[in-house]
Amino acid sequence: LLTNRVHPTRHADSGIFTIEKPNVATDNATPGKRVVVSKGNAPHFIPGRRSWVRYRELGVTEATNGEMRAQVLHAGTANESTGWHLHRCDMQFLYCIDGAITIAFSPDHIVRLEAGDSMMIPGGTIHIEAGAPEGVEILEISIPADMGTESVPNPYGDVQIDFSKAGTVTAR
């Protein structure tokens, strides 16, 4: 039923398409926003900030005019630590679909996300991700879509993170 209302800028090769006016019961969509559908049988991968990660674009950036981005990140077994960094954005939300990833905010604040776990990181929060030797698949949402990444020096000087302590976050 929706095929007559599909936005003309359909990405035929990617399975991503937007619906201009779904004409549902009330049709009070926020101006400038569109319904977007990303078909799993035709994923659209784009370049991203890490060479060892495949970024599946879900079409949200275009549908929200850059106000939000949603991507599925696939990091295989040949991945590495990100180094200390921060993101220039309002927030970054992670939902672990498969595998696991370990993220540290300090030597005492180390979190391991496994399938079904989620985390919201406010923009500007310094952190480091360990490599995920078993691989990981994550849904990442950022507001806004344009999320700058800046490398920063180790805020703890010569202190190295012991990622084996993941999950033992010390509350202060």
Roles of regions detected by a PLM:
Residues 107-124:
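Short acidic-glycine-tyrosine-enriched beta hairpin
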Residues 80-82, 99-104, 118-119:
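Short beta-strand segments in beta-sandwich/barrel cores
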Residues 72-76, 86-103, 141-144:
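Short, conserved beta-strand element in jelly-roll/cupin
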Residues 44-85, 90, 169-172:
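A short glycine-rich, His/Asp/Glu-containing loop-to-beta-strand
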Residues 4, 118, 124-125, 130:
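Short, surface-exposed secondary-structure boundary micro-motifs
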Residues 2-41, 46, 130-172:
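Double-stranded beta-helix
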